[in-house]
């Protein structure tokens, strides 16, 4: 079975939006984020926590998967959504749990960098940046 591409997304600054603008604004942000991810990936995307989303793509090749990630990130950037993203792609080794953990770790690295360097609206890590 082909190993999937995994993309793990997490909103940056949702708590601040909820605190300053109210939970309706935060909910609207979550819905818009979901729309951007769904437009790029369709039924391969899942909301797994309040402001976290995961994509499990077993169908696309590496280049097409990366293009979908870029499309989702671009749509969020155009909507002024600050997001952290980590991805994992393994064509032949590992299992899906390892891939999800790898993507999750990369997402947290991106989130750490976002908060360390706030002039950036979003950051993401590709597997090649290890």
Stretch-by-stretch model annotation:
Residues 40-44, 67-82:
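Short catalytic/binding micro-motifs of nucleotide second-messenger systems
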Residues 66-74, 88-120, 128-130:
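Catalytic-core segments of nucleotide cyclases and related cyclic-nucleotide turnover enzymes
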Residues 1-6, 12-39, 46-50, 54-55, ...:
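Conserved long alpha-helical elements within nucleotide-processing catalytic cores of c-di-GMP signaling
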Residues 13, 61, 92-96:
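Alpha-helix N-cap recognition
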Residues 8, 20, 126-130:
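Gram-positive cell-envelope targeting signals
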């Amino acid at each position: 079975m082909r190993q999937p591409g995994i993309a793990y997304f997490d909103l940056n600054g949702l708590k601040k939006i909820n605190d300053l603008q109210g939970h309706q604004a935060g909910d609207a942000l979550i819905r818009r984020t979901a729309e951007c991810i769904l437009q790029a990936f369709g039924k391969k995307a899942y909301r797994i926590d309040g402001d976290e989303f995961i994509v499990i793509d077993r169908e696309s090749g590496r280049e097409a998967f990366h293009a979908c990630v870029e499309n989702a990130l671009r749509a969020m950037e155009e909507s002024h959504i600050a997001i952290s993203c980590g991805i994992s792609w393994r064509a032949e080794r590992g299992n899906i749990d390892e891939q999800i953990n790898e993507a999750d770790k990369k997402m947290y690295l991106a989130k750490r960098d976002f908060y360390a360097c706030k002039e950036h609206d979003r950051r993401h890590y590709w597997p090649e940046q290890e």
